[in-house]
Amino acid sequence: MQYLAAYALVALSGKTPSKAAVEAVLKAAGVAVDASRVDAVFQELEGKSFDALVAEGRAKLVGSGSAAPAAAASTAAAAAAVVAEAKKEEPEEEADDDMGFGLFD
């Protein structure tokens, strides 16, 4: 993912992505560069424009994006139920009429 992000940063800067530019971005971020991974990214993306890659990724996210909010909502509802249940389980405090503990008798 770091290698693809570095590729994207170079492309978004207006430059044509090159292996040297991607390696420079990774080194600037403190990543130990693996040349074989850089090569793999460039082999996978060969002949594809960055704009086309973004459009393709966006289309994939739209197709699967509807499930995420439902999961988050059900998680929030479950957490609220646990909190409500915990509040019910707390024992009621007994009222002490003698709060002075006999200090001023």
Swiss-Prot record:
Residues 84-105 are annotated as: Disordered. It holds the Pfam family Ribosomal_60s. GO terms for biological process: cytoplasmic translational elongation. One of its GO terms (molecular function) is structural constituent of ribosome. Phosphorylated. InterPro entries: P1/P2_N_sf, Ribosomal_P1/P2, Ribosomal_P1/P2_euk, Ribosomal_P2. Keywords: Phosphoprotein, Ribonucleoprotein, Ribosomal protein. GO terms for cellular component: cytosolic large ribosomal subunit. It comes from the Eukaryota. Belongs to the eukaryotic ribosomal protein P1/P2 family. P1 and P2 exist as dimers at the large ribosomal subunit. Plays an important role in the elongation step of protein synthesis. This is Large ribosomal subunit protein P2. It comes from Leishmania donovani. The gene is ARP-1.
